[in-house]
Amino acid sequence: MREYKLVVLGSGGVGKSALTVQFVQGIFVEKYDPTIEDSYRKQVEVDCQPCMLEILDTAGTEQFTAMRDLYMKNGQGFALVYSITAQSTFNDLQDLREQILRVKDTEDVPMILVGNKCDLEDERVVGKEQGQNLARQWNNCAFLESSAKSKINVNEIFYDLVRQINRKAPVEKCKKKKSQCTLL
């Protein structure tokens, strides 16, 4: 079974943990408890292929930025999350993306831009078009709006990253070994 190392990045309070826990455990975490680093494993099937996802839920706060290079070096796919209710969280993602590209030393990194908390439409300050435009600027990066609370596009975030990784490095099809018989 192929393993995938996915990393969830973004500013503090955007809902990285809520998205991850909703995906892995199917529950919504109401209380905000800042993360230092949490790792989750979940077995899923994407496009008829069994996959083991290792999801790293990272700290959004500035005091843990030294750990980021390591996440970025080891990660295969990245969800860059902002809150549609806070413009600053959207603005912070440009630097994060540039850091990923620098650490990976390539422009071709499986990545998805995620506008979280789309259930809070009344509090929206970042328009959907802003997200779409930024994704276009980022070499047509994938983009979704999500809500951990309302379970909107939660699975799709992680499945999309798996598909991007598979496109970059296709899954080896299992070849049946042919038994050979040699007569002496």
Swiss-Prot record:
<keyword id="KW-0472">Membrane</keyword>
<feature type="propeptide" description="Removed in mature form">
    <location>
        <begin position="182"/>
        <end position="184"/>
    </location>
</feature>
<feature type="lipid moiety-binding region" description="S-geranylgeranyl cysteine">
    <location>
        <position position="181"/>
    </location>
</feature>
<keyword id="KW-0449">Lipoprotein</keyword>
<dbReference type="GO" id="GO:0005525">
    <property type="term" value="F:GTP binding"/>
</dbReference>
<feature type="binding site">
    <location>
        <begin position="57"/>
        <end position="61"/>
    </location>
    <ligand>
        <name>GTP</name>
    </ligand>
</feature>
<feature type="binding site">
    <location>
        <begin position="10"/>
        <end position="17"/>
    </location>
    <ligand>
        <name>GTP</name>
    </ligand>
</feature>
<dbReference type="GO" id="GO:0005886">
    <property type="term" value="C:plasma membrane"/>
</dbReference>
<keyword id="KW-0378">Hydrolase</keyword>
<feature type="modified residue" description="Cysteine methyl ester">
    <location>
        <position position="181"/>
    </location>
</feature>
<feature type="binding site">
    <location>
        <begin position="116"/>
        <end position="119"/>
    </location>
    <ligand>
        <name>GTP</name>
    </ligand>
</feature>
<keyword id="KW-0636">Prenylation</keyword>
<feature type="short sequence motif" description="Effector region">
    <location>
        <begin position="32"/>
        <end position="40"/>
    </location>
</feature>
<dbReference type="GO" id="GO:0003925">
    <property type="term" value="F:G protein activity"/>
</dbReference>
<keyword id="KW-0488">Methylation</keyword>
<dbReference type="InterPro" id="IPR027417">
    <property type="entry name" value="P-loop_NTPase"/>
</dbReference>
<dbReference type="Pfam" id="PF00071">
    <property type="entry name" value="Ras"/>
</dbReference>
<keyword id="KW-1003">Cell membrane</keyword>
<keyword id="KW-0547">Nucleotide-binding</keyword>
<dbReference type="GO" id="GO:0032486">
    <property type="term" value="P:Rap protein signal transduction"/>
</dbReference>
<dbReference type="InterPro" id="IPR038851">
    <property type="entry name" value="Rap1"/>
</dbReference>
<keyword id="KW-0342">GTP-binding</keyword>
<dbReference type="InterPro" id="IPR020849">
    <property type="entry name" value="Small_GTPase_Ras-type"/>
</dbReference>
<dbReference type="InterPro" id="IPR005225">
    <property type="entry name" value="Small_GTP-bd"/>
</dbReference>
<dbReference type="InterPro" id="IPR001806">
    <property type="entry name" value="Small_GTPase"/>
</dbReference>
<protein>
    <recommendedName>
        <fullName>Ras-related protein O-Krev</fullName>
        <ecNumber>3.6.5.2</ecNumber>
    </recommendedName>
</protein>
<comment type="similarity">
    <text>Belongs to the small GTPase superfamily. Ras family.</text>
</comment>
